[in-house]
Amino acid sequence: MDRSLGWQGSSVPEDRTEAGIKRFLEDTTDDGELSKFVKDFSGNESCHPPEAKTWASRPQVLEPRPQAPDLYDDDLEFRPPSWPQSADNQQYFCAPAPLSPSARPRSPWGKLDPYDSSEDDKEYVGFATLPNQVHRKSVKKGFDFTLMVAGESGLGKSTLVNSLFLTDLYRDRKLLGAEERIMQTVEITKHAVDIEEKGVRLRLTIVDTPGFGDAVNNTECWKPVAEYIDQQFEQYFRDESGLNRKNIQDNRVHCCLYFISPFGHGLRPLDVEFMKALHQRVNIVPILAKADTLTPPEVDRKKRKIREEIEHFGIKIYQFPDCDSDEDEDFKLQDQALKESIPFAVIGSNTVVEARGRRVRGRLYPWGIVEVENPGHCDFVKLRTMLVRTHMQDLKDVTRETHYENYRAQCIQSMTRLVVKERNRNKLTRESGTDFPIPAVPPGTDPETEKLIREKDEELRRMQEILHKIQKQMKETY
């Protein structure tokens, strides 16, 4: 059979092609003839044999390779694997495929699902699931958050807390009369409640300070509040330094909402002293209470005045963290709006009223309705967004990394100084030969008392040295 007949679309016989190739292999061939031959030859489809075209167009079907007589029929553990083989007996080997997207566990992260990666499956390792593991463990453990509210009575602290978390923490509260409040001192009360939302549990602790600023003489009325914060730091420090550190209950105060009266022209001296006494211990968020008693221009002037006085007196309130460069633009705008809203002008209400065909929480007045969750009426929504949705974890981080670490460093320095003093006293006692040790300065002593004790210690040390010299002279004489 003539092979040239099997070359479909061929206009050049095989003998002519072979003769042309032999002729161009000679040195006498010029470039013009070579170019013409290459042009004719490149457009010819006869350069591919029909067997090659048929094999390329045939789909690759994986068939099991025929096995030799199996010597391991009785033992499945040592049976060799059966490798696939193509139809033309051309052997090849394939590595086991990685975990396919359909076989991977699903994630509750939605669009941020690290499993749904556009990369090739061969590049998938699995450490992208670490956020899911942390998320699952954190949700199972739950979260703790301690919020302190401070300010004068009657500024709506309890109402605002109930409005923020949609709870009633003060249902059993007893209001004192005027005579009972005359001799009232600042007390610290705690209200704990467990809140669950979409499977996430939050152990919320509200620390209230009834009696603050209600007396005629409010000198150092913030001391009980500062002592309470230090006590929680001390308790956590002891638990952290103990042997059993697995289940440590975190009662540290993560945020303090300080309520400022809307009446007046700015901060009062009590407000300044309170915030200056606590700004190194807790995150302070100033709140302009009862904003419905002010007109919008008055609210703006009041806010501007409070911010100026906070900067003038060197008060360090909670600072919002800077947004990363890869943050969403909407989040950046929201964060900027929160920064500009300090102090938050809020209105609290647990009463549901009807406004324009809707049932909303607000306050009903003869001239209209003030809606608590209306951004045009107050900053309640912004405060809730900052406190619960966007910056709750940052408040806890600042408490742990800044305020608690400062307290912990002070405790370690105090303990180190006491140890050094005790060693020096023991060394002096051994050298002097006396049996009565010099007492140490008790912790928590005020500076004047500590200075007096130190002077007495120096005087006693000089007396011991004189006594030691006299004893030495008497031994040498006799």
Curated annotation (Swiss-Prot):
Residues 141-414 form the Septin-type G domain. The modification Phosphothreonine is found at residue 434. Septins polymerize into heterooligomeric protein complexes that form filaments, and can associate with cellular membranes, actin filaments and microtubules. GTPase activity is required for filament formation. Interacts with SEPTIN8. Component of a septin core octameric complex consisting of SEPTIN12, SEPTIN7, SEPTIN6 and SEPTIN2 or SEPTIN4 in the order 12-7-6-2-2-6-7-12 or 12-7-6-4-4-6-7-12. Interacts with SEPTIN14 (via C-terminus). Interacts with DYRK1A. Interacts with SLC6A3/DAT and SNCA/alpha-synuclein. Interacts with STX1A; in the striatum. Residues 289-292 are annotated as: G4 motif. Residues 151-158 are annotated as: G1 motif. Ubiquitinated by AREL1. Phosphorylated by DYRK1A. The modification Phosphoserine is found at residues 117-118, 325, 432. SUPFAM superfamilies: P-loop containing nucleoside triphosphate hydrolases (SSF52540). The keyword Coiled coil applies. Residues 446-478 form a coiled coil. GTP binds at residues 151-158, 185, 290-298, 348, 363. PROSITE patterns: G_SEPTIN. It comes from the Eukaryota. GO terms for molecular function: GTP binding. The keyword Cell membrane does not apply. Pfam families: Septin. Belongs to the TRAFAC class TrmE-Era-EngA-EngB-Septin-like GTPase superfamily. Septin GTPase family. It is found in: Cytoplasm; Cell projection, Cilium, Flagellum; Cytoplasmic vesicle, Secretory vesicle; Cell projection, Axon. This is Septin-4. Keywords: Cell cycle, Cell division, Cell projection, Cilium, Coiled coil, Cytoplasm, Cytoplasmic vesicle, Differentiation, Flagellum, GTP-binding, Nucleotide-binding, Phosphoprotein, Spermatogenesis, Synapse, Ubl conjugation. Residues 208-211 are annotated as: G3 motif. One of its GO terms (cellular component) is sperm annulus. Residues 95-108 have a biased composition (Low complexity). Filament-forming cytoskeletal GTPase. Pro-apoptotic protein involved in LGR5-positive intestinal stem cell and Paneth cell expansion in the intestines, via its interaction with XIAP. May also play a role in the regulation of cell fate in the intestine. Positive regulator of apoptosis involved in hematopoietic stem cell homeostasis; via its interaction with XIAP. Negative regulator of repair and hair follicle regeneration in response to injury, due to inhibition of hair follicle stem cell proliferation, potentially via its interaction with XIAP. InterPro entries: G_SEPTIN_dom, P-loop_NTPase, Septin. It comes from Macaca fascicularis (Crab-eating macaque). One of its GO terms (biological process) is spermatid differentiation.
